[in-house]
Regions:
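An internal, D/E-rich "acidic patch" concept
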Residues: 56-113
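Hydrophobic alpha-helical transmembrane segments of polytopic membrane proteins
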Residues: 19, 106-114, 177-188, 260-298
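Generic hydrophobic transmembrane alpha-helix motif, especially the helices
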Residues: 109, 132-187, 264-266, 272
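Membrane-cytosol interface at the C-terminal ends of specific transmembrane alpha-helices
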Residues: 170-210
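Hydrophobic alpha-helical transmembrane segments of membrane transport/permease proteins
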Residues: 16-65, 156, 160-173
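Transmembrane alpha-helix signature in integral membrane proteins
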Residues: 9, 16-17, 21, 89-120, ...
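Cytoplasmic-entry segments and transmembrane alpha-helices of multi-pass inner-membrane transporters
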Residues: 2-11, 117-153
Length: 313
């Protein structure tokens, strides 16, 4: 396991380096307005002097080296547009907590409803609970997310008696965005748990339990469900972290001052330093989620040995 994790972390670091470096290079192809708050009022000489002071006239490999050197010391530069001369790390530290809170609540909601739904669907395969659950999953996956997000906001704000401007101090303002963020994962957990339970139900140990007279409910809860949860567990950390960093539309829709709205604003206003800092954070979060998924899977089922799996390839 340790050897596997070492290899996985090494590959993840390489992936992180490639992704962020590629984005860094692409941002250098963008107009230079993103580095100056008052670009329209500046002369060409002032622009060139500013670019020189920021090191943007250096050769690209030199710029990449300086970026990673500073990033490894916790310095992602300063915002030039969003908040003039404010450190990128400070802005990220201000915006990330509310996105994490939203993500935690959405994950809990999706697990609380998605796991029981998948369990019931797997237990009653082909019967009306399974058919109703399947219809719900198909509806969530077939309809574009933006459509049901808008409907939830349209009818939910009236029913909840809340406005369109988010108020973090009032719990009612959290209900609609959290419900919206949880729907996709709820359907995902239910669909895959149902599928894994159906697969487990056809295995020999289940047939043996039935032959011994064990009740179907006992088999479903204590044997099939437990084994079906093992492959599903590895997706929970990455699903949670993807919810945190992938809530761009939800946060913009409800004016939530989190990471999603920050990315949209910085892209629209061409704040290149902020964009590359956000991309670095997102890449780190995604990679951490994948590694945590593997670790959690082994903790739940010690029979899994990634080292042997890799060695057999």
């Amino acid at each position: 396991m340790v050897q596997y994790l070492a290899k996985r972390i090494g590959r993840s670091i390489l992936t992180l380096f490639v992704i962020v470096t590629l984005v860094f290079c692409l941002l250098r192809l963008m107009p230079v307005e993103g580095y100056f708050a008052n670009y329209e009022k500046m002369t060409e000489a002032q622009i060139q002097a500013g670019l020189q002071s920021m090191g943007l006239l250096d050769p690209l490999p030199v710029q990449i080296g300086h970026f990673w050197r500073d990033a490894l010391h916790g310095d992602l530069g300063v915002s030039h547009i969003y908040k003039l001369n404010a450190p990128v790390t400070r802005i990220l530290a201000q915006k990330l907590p509310i996105s994490i809170e939203m993500g935690v609540l959405a994950m809990l909601l999706s697990l609380i409803f998605g796991i029981p739904l998948g369990l019931v669907m797997g237990r009653y395969k082909g019967r009306w609970p399974d058919k109703l659950g399947t219809a719900f999953i198909v509806l969530v996956q077939a309809v574009p997310a933006a459509v049901y997000f808008l409907y939830i906001q349209m009818y939910g704000t009236t029913a909840m008696g809340v406005g369109l401007l988010f108020d973090a101090a009032n719990w009612r303002y959290w209900v609609l965005p959290v419900c919206s963020m949880s729907l996709a994962n709820l359907a995902f957990y239910a669909m895959w748990l149902r599928r894994y339970m159906v697969d487990e139900s056809n295995k020999d140990y289940v047939k043996l339990a039935r032959a011994k007279g064990v009740s179907e409910n006992n088999i479903a809860l204590h044997h099939v469900f437990r084994n079906a949860m093992v492959p599903l567990v590895q997706y929970i950390p990455s699903a949670f972290l993807n919810t945190v960093v992938g809530s761009i539309y939800i946060e913009s829709l409800y004016s939530i001052p989190g990471m999603g709205g920050l990315l949209v604003t910085c892209v629209q206003r061409h704040d290149n330093t902020m964009v590359q800092g956000i991309v670095l954070l997102y890449a780190c979060v995604g990679i951490i989620g994948l590694i945590l998924g593997d670790v959690l899977m082994v903790l739940i089922d010690p029979r899994i040995n990634f080292g042997k799996k890799e060695g057999g390839r």
